[in-house]
Amino acid sequence: MKRPLIIGVGGPVGAGKTMLIERLTRYLSTKGYSMAAITNDIYTKEDARILLNTSVLPADRIAGVETGGCPHTAIREDASMNFAAIEEMCDKHPDLQLLFLESGGDNLSATFSPDLVDFSIYIIDVAQGEKIPRKGGQGMIKSDLFIINKVDLAPYVGANVEVMKADTLKSRGNKDFFVTNLKTDEGLKSVADWIEKRLQLALLEE
């Protein structure tokens, strides 16, 4: 059995990780892909519960992992709990093509082990401050795709999205990034297309 394409989704608490997965699975479900999602929380399975209530994915395609302690460790140094959750999900669904793995909320420094995920997405929101892209952080710099979410809030928090874009280019060079408002699906298609391009290449290799 070939492993599905695994996309890691990281970012600070409240940036929109769970909503991104909910919106992406809803959009990509219209293309007929076989998908699943695994969420990480420190002491609860709250994000998994949210997906169960909002996602188009059936309940048996959503799993929650309680990492305990530091959420960074569960996606990098000791990812054994997530490897086990992925294996269990793949055993239940041998047809799985795409799996989203959501990290616990962090402080800009979390990165996924390359053994755990094929590609990583890091998402922030403008309410966390215009300076975030300027500050960098390993999660933002090393991710394959960077997303600036909740751009609709920029006028209310005094953030200049154009400045954030310019700072992102300085921090990430020519690596991909998008701006989104997931509440209205603004920018969602760009993110979905980015994923689908990589998924199609992976499927061709089967």
From Swiss-Prot:
Matches recorded under Pfam families: cobW
InterPro entries, alphabetized: CobW/HypB/UreG_nucleotide-bd (IPR003495), P-loop_NTPase (IPR027417), UreG (IPR004400)
Main location: cytoplasm
Cited Gene3D superfamilies: P-loop containing nucleotide triphosphate hydrolases
GO molecular function, one term: GTPase activity
Cytoplasm in keyword set: yes
Residues bound to GTP: G11, P12, V13, G14, A15, G16, K17, T18
Keywords: Chaperone, Cytoplasm, GTP-binding, Nickel insertion, Nucleotide-binding
A Gene Ontology BP annotation from the UniProt entry: urea catabolic process
GO cellular component, one term: cytoplasm
Compartments where found: Cytoplasm
PANTHER family, A to Z: UREASE ACCESSORY PROTEIN G (PTHR31715:SF0)
Family listed: Belongs to the SIMIBI class G3E GTPase family. UreG subfamily.
Function noted in UniProt: Facilitates the functional incorporation of the urease nickel metallocenter. This process requires GTP hydrolysis, probably effectuated by UreG.
Subunit structure: Homodimer. UreD, UreF and UreG form a complex that acts as a GTP-hydrolysis-dependent molecular chaperone, activating the urease apoprotein by helping to assemble the nickel containing metallocenter of UreC. The UreE protein probably delivers the nickel.
Name the UniProt record assigns to this protein: Urease accessory protein UreG
